Amino acid sequence: MYGIEYTTILIFLISIILLNYILKSVTRIMDYIIYRFLLITVALFALTRAQNYGLNLPITGSMDAVYTNSTQEEVFLTSTLCLYYPTEASTQINDGDWKDSLSQMFLTKGWPTGSVYFKEYSSIVDFSVDPQLYCDYNLVLMKYDQSLELDMSELADLILNEWLCNPMDVTLYYYQQSGESNKWISMGSSCTVKVCPLNTQTLGIGCQTTNVDSFEMIAENEKLAIVDVVDGINHKINLTTTTCTIRNCKKLGPRENVAVIQVGGSNVLDITADPTTNPQTERMMRVNWKKWWQVFYTIVDYINQIVQVMSKRSRSLNSAAFYYRV
């Protein structure tokens, strides 16, 4: 009798253990199936909703050839070329159809109609305040003017290089430059920048920190000023904050999708003498023609050779992007 009871109890315990094992196995299998299903669902959702950042943006994200986007139906754009020229050019040409004529000429060089954009600017100083370099390849035509030689040089330094910049609060803090690649760049309708170098006791060196008139003036009524001071020394800065902003910038390297073409002048502007220009090459050329039609004809003729020394980038440059990351 006792043997039968013990057997019954043993069978009951074995059944409970077996049932528990089966339930755990089923739970593990269900967890595996559910997690796999969720993983596949998330992956498919991310793939179908993916955005190829920079590929669907006009002009800035174009590609060399036409490809089909793997996640969307739109096709990529073709390479784009922006030609920036002064108002003087269109005034001298005085032809309402001159852009269409040039577009047809660019077509003979392999640039499809609609891939070349003509951008007019009023003056070098105005263009330097808000450069808009949105195309895959950007050619900036600058008419040489001896009185604006320094402005042209600073603009070339700005647009031919990439800069990493951060805002500066000159009312609260002192600032110093850490090396040759570190510059302060001020931009605005009228920038007057004064500095007072400080010693280790934060006393002015040759100036009084409480007297702005004793500060050293390094830019006056400029629209663009790239400021270089002695490295490793704190400076108190004064500038016209109502009409100007200033940023603490580091030169990262060449912006290879931009070239500057100087029109006229006895010498080509040279920014490679700056020790921060590395490598010591530049995409600056000169054409010596008196008439703008001749200038544009020359550019059409040599456009493919010019582009060969450039590299297309998807990043664009405007004043806002320049301030934070170019």
UniProtKB/Swiss-Prot annotation:
Q: Which residues form the signal peptide?
A: 1-50
| Entry similarity comment | Belongs to the rotavirus VP7 family.
| Span list, region CNP motif | 165-167
Q: Where in the cell is it found?
A: Virion; Host endoplasmic reticulum lumen
Cysteine pairings via disulfide bonds: C82-C135, C165-C249, C191-C244, C196-C207
Question: What task does this protein carry out?
Answer: Calcium-binding protein that interacts with rotavirus cell receptors once the initial attachment by VP4 has been achieved. Rotavirus attachment and entry into the host cell probably involves multiple sequential contacts between the outer capsid proteins VP4 and VP7, and the cell receptors. Following entry into the host cell, low intracellular or intravesicular Ca(2+) concentration probably causes the calcium-stabilized VP7 trimers to dissociate from the virion. This step is probably necessary for the membrane-disrupting entry step and the release of VP4, which is locked onto the virion by VP7.
Protein name, per record: Outer capsid glycoprotein VP7
Sequence positions that bind Ca(2+) 1: D95, G206, S214, E216
Q: What else is known?
A: Some rotavirus strains are neuraminidase-sensitive and require sialic acid to attach to the cell surface. Some rotavirus strains are integrin-dependent. Some rotavirus strains depend on ganglioside for their entry into the host cell. Hsp70 also seems to be involved in the entry of some strains. In group A rotaviruses, VP7 defines the G serotype.
